[in-house]
Design a protein with these regions (language model features):
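Predominantly soluble domains enriched in secretory-pathway, periplasmic, or organellar proteins
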Residues: 1-229
Length: 229
């Protein structure tokens, strides 16, 4: 069969998004309207435009996990403020929470670009590379999936230069890799850029892969093919 194209009216301007845990619903940021547009790909229709309560949502692909109160959820951070918005995604098992913002977590600051978790991890990681506060640009925030009301559980400063951006888990879900944006002019100082490998359980740095010029997205093939995030 030839592929078909379905035009679905949503919101402005669609940029970055990912699947819910069932791979039926696609959630995408409408960053000019501070909303997440949710598409039912089975019925090929818009389910909802959810107000995120933040400014300029930027989820990357977002993060999926099962909350003890709200059931399956998906989350996004924001460029314009410190809000992490959590949206229910289970219309069958938790209809009262589905396609609504069910909770917020306060990040360290504005300037978040990516949020990441893994089914085998208890943590959700957020970056702040375009924060107005320089110290936060190289600091990751971590919160507990089972206790979102507890807010940020721990912070981890991963470099003394540049900006920390885009976390990615390994296949096992026990390491998280983060890029450091550096500067080519500082290559002789070892500050052109690198990837930092972190132990997810202990939240400590295991190793560094140095001398990379502004590495950004890193995608584990196993996780990416299966939309694990």
């Amino acid at each position: 069969n030839n592929p078909t194209i379905t035009m679905i009216e949503a919101e402005r301007f669609l940029h970055d998004g990912g699947w819910d845990s069932t791979k039926r619903y696609f959630l995408v940021a409408a960053n000019a309207r501070n909303k997440i547009s949710i598409i039912d790909t089975k019925e090929r229709k818009l389910v909802a435009n959810v107000d995120t309560g933040g400014t300029k949502p930027h989820p990357g692909r977002g993060a999926n996990w099962v909350d003890p109160e709200f059931g399956p959820v998906w989350a996004t951070g924001h460029i314009g403020d410190d809000v992490i918005s959590i949206i229910g995604t289970d219309p069958e098992g938790h209809p009262e929470h589905a396609f609504k913002m069910v909770a917020k977590v306060q990040a360290l600051s504005s300037g978040n670009l990516f949020i990441k978790t893994h089914p085998k991890s208890k943590w959700v990681w957020v970056d702040h590379p375009v924060s107005k506060k320089e110290v936060n640009r190289t600091t990751l925030g971590i919160f507990d999936k089972a206790n979102i009301k507890g807010g940020i559980f721990k912070t981890l400063k991963v470099a003394d230069y540049g900006k920390a951006v885009h976390m990615e888990y390994n296949k096992a879900g026990d390491e998280i890799w983060v890029s450091i944006w550096g500067n080519l002019g500082d290559a002789d100082k070892g500050k052109a850029g690198e990837i930092v490998v972190i132990d997810d359980a202990t939240m400590t740095i295991k190793t560094r892969i140095p001398n990379l010029l502004t590495p950004t997205g890193k995608f584990n093939v196993y996780n990416t093919v299966r939309d694990i995030y």
